[in-house]
Amino acid sequence: MATQDFYQVLGVSKDANERDIKKAYKRMAMKYHPDRTEGDKDMEIKFKEIKQAYEVLSDPQKRQMYDQYGHEAFEQARQGGAGHGAGGFGGGGADFADIFGDVFGDIFGGGRRQQARAQRGADLRYNLDMSLEEAVRGKTVELEIPTLVECRDCNGSGAKKGSKPQTCGHCHGSGQIQMRQGFFAVQQTCPQCRGTGTIIKDPCRTCHGHGRKEETKTLSVKIPAGVDTGDRIRLANEGEAGEHGAPAGDLYVQVHVREHPIFARDGNNLFCEVPVSFTKAALGGDIEVPTLEGKVKLKVPKETQTGKHFRLRGKGVKSVRTGEVGDLICKVMIETPVNLSSKQRDMLEELEDSMGTGDEAAKFRPKEKGFFDGVKQFFDDLRS
């Protein structure tokens, strides 16, 4: 990254106080910010140098280490931590990887050596398809899950029965080795044991030393009432078995609710369209509407218009989180009669004639009058 001394990058002296460093950073960052330099690659690099310099010099601990070991030491540690070319193993000198690891680890990825640990099992996902009725009421389902399970013959160790894994002699069980580069020691995963810290000299014949084997397991899963598309149910430790006795992953059941031929769902409310004859809508009366528990009666007032909504409280879905029950909202759709006989057409024409025309008919069809009045006003405005 920065080839210049960090103090030079920010344009401050080595005895600059925190306020001066912050002020210089703001000035330089504003000057070289990518939004101002319009994709200039050199300016982007300069901006990153400024940011890196400020990250070090604004932190008292990092600044003290930087002042003590110098910019060249910092650059070598950064390059080593980033996995650049390295010299041989061993060698003398201070272990600067440990010194810089905690202090500069957030900048160039360094860190202290960690004890080798077996890898946790992978998480699994199962897509569960459900009907609306099943989702609303809840159900218990049997799931067939192809997965990796712990080998029963070696109890997950990977070693043949009667034997056990041996400590890796290359890394002495740490799973990490050190490579020297100048003054610095760079940690890498041990190639002999691949970071596990152990070597299996006599592998289990069932799992071939992996400690796990492929198997399809059956799980009985209770799906709570009220789930909806997008909900996810976590089953802890039901994912793939971990390596060599490490914890298993989790299983996530992803819910998808199929579309229903009658009901649509929005949150905890259900919606449906209810056909009503034009005579029933005009005269009023009772109709039957469907719910998930069966049919119920709904009183339709006289002169009901198409699109009118009626709310049936408590006939929706029970929330899986709060326990509150939503409503069923019915939208009236008035049906125009079809396949009329001659007599029925004559009766409708007689009804139409009885309503008159013009202003006389407006009281029977207020929306129609309002619509045509609006159309007339629209064209009047165009002409004016």
From Swiss-Prot:
The keyword Hydrolase does not apply. GO terms for cellular component: cytoplasm. Binds 2 Zn(2+) ions per monomer. GO terms for biological process: chaperone cofactor-dependent protein refolding; DNA replication; protein refolding; response to heat. GO terms for molecular function: ATP binding; heat shock protein binding; unfolded protein binding; zinc ion binding. It comes from the Bacteria. It holds the Pfam family DnaJ_C. Its cofactor is Zn(2+). InterPro entries: DnaJ, DnaJ_C, DnaJ_domain, DnaJ_domain_CS, HSP40/DnaJ_pept-bd, HSP_DnaJ_Cys-rich_dom, HSP_DnaJ_Cys-rich_dom_sf, J_dom_sf. CXXCXGXG motif repeats lie at residues 151-158, 168-175, 190-197, 204-211. SUPFAM superfamilies: Chaperone J-domain, DnaJ/Hsp40 cysteine-rich domain, HSP40/DnaJ peptide-binding domain. Its main location: cytoplasm. Zn(2+) 2 binds at residues 168, 171, 190, 193. Keywords: Chaperone, Cytoplasm, DNA replication, Metal-binding, Repeat, Stress response, Zinc, Zinc-finger. It is found in: Cytoplasm. Belongs to the DnaJ family. The J domain is necessary and sufficient to stimulate DnaK ATPase activity. Zinc center 1 plays an important role in the autonomous, DnaK-independent chaperone activity of DnaJ. Zinc center 2 is essential for interaction with DnaK and for DnaJ activity. Participates actively in the response to hyperosmotic and heat shock by preventing the aggregation of stress-denatured proteins and by disaggregating proteins, also in an autonomous, DnaK-independent fashion. Unfolded proteins bind initially to DnaJ; upon interaction with the DnaJ-bound protein, DnaK hydrolyzes its bound ATP, resulting in the formation of a stable complex. GrpE releases ADP from DnaK; ATP binding to DnaK triggers the release of the substrate protein, thus completing the reaction cycle. Homodimer. This is Chaperone protein DnaJ. It comes from Idiomarina loihiensis (strain ATCC BAA-735 / DSM 15497 / L2-TR).
